[in-house]
Structure formats: C-alpha cells, structure tokens
Amino acid sequence: MTDSHYIGRFAPSPSGELHFGSLIAALGSYLQARAQRGVWRVRIEDIDPPREVPGAAATILRQLEHYGLHWDGEVLWQSQRHEAYREALAWLHEQGLSYYCTCPRSRIQRLGGIYDGHCRTLCHGPENAAVRIKQQHPVMHFHDALRGDIQADPQLASEDFIIHRRDGLFAYNLAVVVDDHFQGVTEIVRGADLIEPTVRQLSLYKQFGWRAPGYVHLPLALNEQGAKLSKQNHAPALATGDPRPVLVQALRFLGQRDVVAWQEMSVEELLRFAVAHWRLTAVPTSANVNPAFSNASR
C-alpha cells in the first residue's frame, strides 16, 4: 500500500550477478522509496546484448527477492521498449534536434574525448552513422539531495553526445530518460559513478520538454585496491545464504542506525526496521572499501 506520489526505481544491466556495490544501490533506492510510502520499480536495462551474460537477468531478480527487496508492478525490460526509443529519436529528428555523425572513435580520441560538433552542419545520411543530440540546453549544474549542488564539466555538459550508436544500438542516456519518464520516476537513487552522465540526461529532459526527476548519488563500495566494485573487475556475487548479515553490513555502509538483535529478526522485519529508521542525511558521500561481511555478526 502506498499513499505517496514518490516513484523510485532500481535499473541493473544483466552483465552479471549483483554484488555488494549493486546491493548498496538497490537497498538505498528501496529504502528511500519505502520510507516515503512510495512505489519502487525494477527495470532490466538489457539494450546492449554484447555486454549481457545469459541468465543474468533472471538471477538478478532472484537475488532481489532473496534479499527481501520486492518491487511494485511488472518488471520493465528495455529490450521490449525499442519502439518507444525509435519514436523518441524520430521526434528529435523532426524537431531538428539531432543529426547523423560519421566521425570515427579515433578522431574523437585525438580531440581528447570530447566531440567538437564536426558533423553538425554536414547533413549526413543514416548509413554507417551514429545519431547525436544537437545540444540546445546544456546543464551546468544540478541539485543532488545528498550531495547538494554539483557542478558539471562545461565541455562535457555542452557536448553533442550520442543517442543512437553506429552499430544500431540505442544509447544508454536516451533509453534511461525515455523509460524514467514513461515509468513516472520522481527520484533516481543510484551510485556516484553515474554523476557524470546526469547532466546529459537532464539536458534530454529539457529537449523533450519533460519534467526531470530528483537525484541522489550514493557512495561507491570499493575493493581493497581502491577500485569500484563492479562486474568488470570481478566483484564477488552476493552470498546465496542468509541475507541478513549482508543487509546489516549494507545498512552500516549507508550510515544507518545499527540493528540491535538482528539475528532474532526475519528479513522482512529487518527491512521494516530499516525503512522506519531510514535517514538520507546519515548516508556518507565518500566512497569506502567494501567491509568484510563477517563483521556484521559483531
């Protein structure tokens, strides 16, 4: 039962199983939504087949359920949303807000990684071309409910970024904006590694004339080498046994009130306690090394 207009979401890509860093993002977004008696949705961002691991999407959903993170409504699959993305691309093209670009990656690398708008006035056709947004509304800063005002890199914010790839795949920034708007998401709670693309996504909201959601970027969990826990650096999957000690460790990572006698609680009771005592203001802003799960039993 919800009595709030708040809608949050967790949107993993099926490039591997969830790990502790994924749990931080999932749990943080879940608690932020439930604490406001809001809706919490799950979306599988399966628009990049070369990066996807067979069976990972089903495993991710099982992991969420195992950890007591039950979502509202049906899971949205980006692989079933291609028509919506095509419609968005067509609208931008009709409005003169996008163009075809044939510049190779090597040219952009020579420029330092920021595209210079070379193809903006060249009137290329779609053959062997990417589609770039014609940036009209660069966003130079935005408010993060945890971190305050975040300033963007001016060059990055002003760049004509890709919204449809040369290989025919829809770009992440386009798909995520179209889907968050479609799902009515009011606030996005995710990891701090996604701070940088936020200004691009906000500029797309302006291009489409849509109301943008709020943002919260949670601290990243790091490995012992100081690198972000990720599927790419082989972060271990979440434990398949008792989820409670891992949930307690995740709550501590998020700066939340310690759960006394959690061993006597069910997963559902533990999460109800966490929702009742959730404080976004207690969440740290700096990344931290993934703590040893065994410490949860202290």
Swiss-Prot record:
Listed binding positions for Zn(2+) are 101, 103, 115, 119
Task: Copy out the cofactor comment.
Answer: Binds 1 zinc ion per subunit.
InterPro entries per UniProt: Glu-Q_tRNA(Asp)_Synthase, Glu/Gln-tRNA-synth, Glu/Gln-tRNA-synth_Ib_cat-dom, GluQ/Sye, Rossmann-like_a/b/a_fold
Alphabetical UniProt keywords: Aminoacyl-tRNA synthetase, ATP-binding, Ligase, Metal-binding, Nucleotide-binding, Zinc
Alphabetized GO MF terms: ATP binding; glutamate-tRNA ligase activity; zinc ion binding
According to its record, what are the GO cellular component terms?
cytosol
Q: Identify which cofactors the protein needs according to its UniProt entry.
A: Zn(2+)
Q: Where does ATP bind?
A: 231
Q: Where is this motif: 'KMSKS' region?
A: 228-232
Where does this chain carry the motif 'HIGH' region? 12-22
Residues that bind L-glutamate: 9-13, 45, 172, 190
- Biological processes, Gene Ontology terms: glutamyl-tRNA aminoacylation; tRNA modification
Keyword match Aminoacyl-tRNA synthetase: yes
Q: Family, per the entry?
A: Belongs to the class-I aminoacyl-tRNA synthetase family. GluQ subfamily.
Q: Which NCBIfam families match?
A: PRK05710.1-1 (NF004312), PRK05710.1-3 (NF004314), queuosine_YadB (TIGR03838)
Record-given protein name: Glutamyl-Q tRNA(Asp) synthetase
Give the organism, scientific name. Answer: Salmonella typhi
